[in-house]
């Protein structure tokens, strides 16, 4: 029974002390352990019962069991002492300290504090964003933070820049760009023109080659004819003589 006087930590073991205690009560969130030489009981939360996940503490311990624990926390709340114990950092067979440098305990404490800070900030922000101002009727702020003058312009939350950018991107994907299409058409037309020019140049070169061949053949025929005429003239002269 509490006599009305605030509890003190004088009879409690020192921080990080290892001792063997008896299980006094088992709940859904952990087990209460009797502290030797003290009327106070300490709580082993289910997250500190084992290195594995524990959903039901009653599957790990039962009332009257003797367990090895390590005192990992002592704090005063509303004139009452809250004692935190851990089973997973102590060998349950020998009572040996499995975390002599308290590394695991410090990591657990850091994680717990960061989680509390994050959830607190999240709840506060959601409460503010979902609040409707009684003064101007807009969402996102309280009446005490409203700067609207009587008869003035009302202002509400504007959409984030990222949302606007995403909408613009979606519109850009839906609507085809006419400049891109025209540039593609121009490129195709240029390729066709180049192909035509190459064909015409090839034809011209073949025609010129055929013309030169014909001229060469014609000139060779003329030279042969002149030679034959000369031979005939010489033959006539000899015959006269």
Swiss-Prot record:
GO CC terms, sorted: cytosolic large ribosomal subunit; nucleolus
Zinc finger (CCHC-type): 131-148
Subcellular location, record wording: Nucleus, Nucleolus
Domain of life: Eukaryota
Main location: nucleus
Keywords linked to the UniProt accession: Acetylation, Metal-binding, Nucleus, Phosphoprotein, Ribonucleoprotein, Zinc, Zinc-finger
Extent of Basic and acidic residues compositional bias: 166-178, 211-225
Residues of the S1 motif domain: 16-88
Region (Disordered) residue spans: 160-241
Modified residues (N6-acetyllysine): 144
Tissue expression notes: Expressed in liver, brain, heart, kidney testis, stomach, small intestine, skin, thymus, uterus, placenta, spleen, lung and skeletal muscle.
Single GO term (MF): RNA binding
Biased composition regions of type Basic residues, renumbered to the chain: 182-198, 226-241
Keyword Membrane in record: no
Alphabetical list of SMART domains matching this protein: S1
PROSITE patterns: S1 (PS50126), ZF_CCHC (PS50158)
Pfam families: S1
Positions of modified residues (Phosphoserine): 114, 183
Summary of subunit composition and partner proteins: Interacts with PNN. Associates with the 60S ribosomal subunit.
PANTHER family, alphabetized: NUCLEOLAR PROTEIN OF 40 KDA, ZINC FINGER CCHC DOMAIN-CONTAINING PROTEIN 17
Protein name: Zinc finger CCHC domain-containing protein 17
Species: Mus musculus (Mouse)
């Amino acid at each position: 029974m509490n006599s009305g006087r605030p509890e003190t930590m004088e009879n409690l073991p020192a921080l990080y002390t290892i001792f063997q205690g008896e299980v006094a009560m088992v709940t859904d969130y952990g087990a209460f352990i009797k502290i030797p030489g003290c009327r106070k009981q300490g709580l082993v939360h289910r997250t500190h019962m084992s290195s594995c996940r524990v959903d039901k503490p009653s599957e790990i311990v039962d009332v009257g069991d003797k367990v090895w624990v390590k005192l990992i926390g002592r704090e005063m709340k509303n004139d009452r002492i809250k004692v935190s114990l851990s089973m997973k950092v102590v060998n349950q067979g020998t009572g040996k300290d499995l975390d002599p440098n308290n590394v695991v305990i410090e990591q657990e404490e850091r994680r717990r504090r960061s989680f509390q800070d994050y959830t607190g900030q999240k709840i506060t922000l959601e409460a503010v964003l979902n609040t409707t101002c009684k003064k101007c009727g807009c969402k996102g702020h309280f009446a005490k933070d409203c700067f609207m003058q009587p008869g003035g312009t009302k202002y509400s939350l504007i959409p984030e820049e990222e949302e606007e950018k995403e909408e613009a991107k979606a519109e850009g994907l839906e609507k085809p760009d006419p400049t891109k299409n025209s540039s593609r058409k121009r490129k195709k037309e240029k390729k066709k023109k180049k192909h035509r020019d190459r064909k015409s140049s090839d034809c011209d070169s073949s025609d010129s080659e055929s013309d030169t061949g014909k001229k060469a053949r014609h000139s060779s025929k003329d030279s042969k004819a002149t030679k034959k005429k000369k031979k005939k003239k010489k033959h006539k002269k000899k015959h006269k003589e």
